[in-house]
Amino acid sequence: MRTEARADFSSQETVRYSRNTLLDQVGWEGQARWRASRVMVVGAGGIGSAALLYLAAAGVGRLGLVDGDAVEESNLQRQILYRSADLGRQKVAVAEAALTALNPHCRVETFDQRLNPANVKEVLHGFEVVLDASDNFPTRFLLAECCWRDGIPLVSAAATGWYGKLLVALPGAENPCYRCLVPEMPSAEAVPSSSESGILGAVAGTMGCLQAVEALKLLLGRESNLTRRLLAYDGLAGRFQSLARIKRPDCPLCGQGK
């Protein structure tokens, strides 16, 4: 896909993105795709922080961000968008300023709220790829359903302790959805929060970086191996595993007759 530098990129952009465009799979045509693309990130925590920074740095033209929380002291161990001076400020405001400072060519649209069934379609409208960097199953299930029904590719990541997981749910008759893997919502007691079980910040960041990689590939029109697989990361053992995901005929979201 590599091509000569394009006249519609400024001299500053030409230098900024030169390392991207040297990649055969990107080139200036791919860089132009990224600049014209629209990516939504749900959750500006440990995973979302890393994903947002690398998407902005790569040159994604429009980033959406949903988060209704303020910056807390305990966030700073892993949520690298924020600094000590940001304590008490709303995350989306801090994130917008940080991302714009990193790349002024990137437009950031923020939603200082939590997703719910009443607002999810409006918030996601117009975005080509959605990254689920949330930390709770109600939001994950809501995104899984809305993205699948509206035909939006979903890149979902989670992290706890030393461990992380990543998958891509690409709507299509032959592909499994998120709920083929997690058909029913786990109870709150079965899934402890990071405040209960702990989390290594670098693991959350690793999963956010991998999320950004998958999103950037999708925007180039490249197929992801994770549409039918789950990538599991064990930071303690220093090991990745790629596990098969199967489309379930009885899936409550994408099964037969759905």
Label the model's feature ranges.
Residues M1-K258:
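Adenine nucleotide-associated cytosolic modules
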